[in-house]
Amino acid sequence: MRSHTITMTTTSVSSWPYSSHRMRFITNHSDQPPQNFSATPNVTTCPMDEKLLSTVLTTSYSVIFIVGLVGNIIALYVFLGIHRKRNSIQIYLLNVAIADLLLIFCLPFRIMYHINQNKWTLGVILCKVVGTLFYMNMYISIILLGFISLDRYIKINRSIQQRKAITTKQSIYVCCIVWMLALGGFLTMIILTLKKGGHNSTMCFHYRDKHNAKGEAIFNFILVVMFWLIFLLIILSYIKIGKNLLRISKRRSKFPNSGKYATTARNSFIVLIIFTICFVPYHAFRFIYISSQLNVSSCYWKEIVHKTNEIMLVLSSFNSCLDPVMYFLMSSNIRKIMCQLLFRRFQGEPSRSESTSEFKPGYSLHDTSVAVKIQSSSKST
């Protein structure tokens, strides 16, 4: 293995040398941001070899882009093909699919950036737009998954008369509020970037110190805290859902369909496992990452933090591939709708089986009619 010497150098922005696969972390110690491309503030740079990391990121994001694009387009096609009135869960899932697609559309920019030896040539504004859109849609998906777990928990634990407490209209309002808040934050970030002006850096998706941008670091910290609150909500909701389903399964063990309750309970925990694998590593490491940005750190430590953060981010992006996989592999109704729509699309005639206009949720991963079955069986026992 080749050894690399990490050095600290002070140079002007306009004279940064770039080798084939070397990048320099940028630490701006100036109190004021550069106002134009001719500015030459003193910066401390940390060169390092990123050849292997760039290869891994390019390959990973390419796979995620292809699989995620196909899966989410099909998922969106299926959700839009449901002609009957959608329930609240379907509204949330539709918006999750849209957020996943928007995140996936950001990946080609990252792929080209790493292919181009970590050089960004499209300007600081587009860099900020792509980066902010990426994170915006990731957190929209996280928030909506939290609302899905809350929705299921409420409907399963309330009586039949109260089970419509969360209506379709209310779920639409929730999604609209989430999107408006996200877009408001997005526009704020872009406006702040425009006010700061451009800088002569060809780096985009990389580690940057926050010594003079503590407000942005605090905002990132708030997002991390929000994630852990949502994660706690999901854990409590699905544990409660799983316990209820398993209890009903034992009570109705003599009935032919008793196994469906246990299957749905297992599926609920699979959702929790996938959410944990994709998002928990990234957000657990974010505390270290943000702390490193705010404090003076060695180049060696910055290199470790940067590379670890990039790998964790790949895991988070991979969730956009797993969402449609969960829809289809773990929900017989979604698979049925997909087959019906594809059959009608390619054969030009409706399927003999149940049409999409008569779609009735059953024991799927996110469907909520199981709440009615649980409450009914509870009262009958």
Swiss-Prot record:
Belongs to the G-protein coupled receptor 1 family. It comes from the Eukaryota. It comes from Homo sapiens. G-protein-coupled receptor of lysophosphatidylserine (LysoPS) that plays different roles in immune response. Acts a damage-sensing receptor that triggers tissue repair upon recognition of dying neutrophils. Mechanistically, apoptotic neutrophils release lysophosphatydilserine that are recognized by type 3 innate lymphoid cells (ILC3s) via GPR34, which activates downstream PI3K-AKT and RAS-ERK signaling pathways leading to STAT3 activation and IL-22 production. Plays an important role in microglial function, controlling morphology and phagocytosis. This is Probable G-protein coupled receptor 34. The chain crosses the membrane at residues 62-82, 89-109, 129-149, 172-192, 217-237, 270-290, 311-331. InterPro entries: GPCR_Rhodpsn (IPR000276), GPCR_Rhodpsn_7TM (IPR017452), GPR34_7tmA (IPR048057). One of its GO terms (molecular function) is G protein-coupled receptor activity.
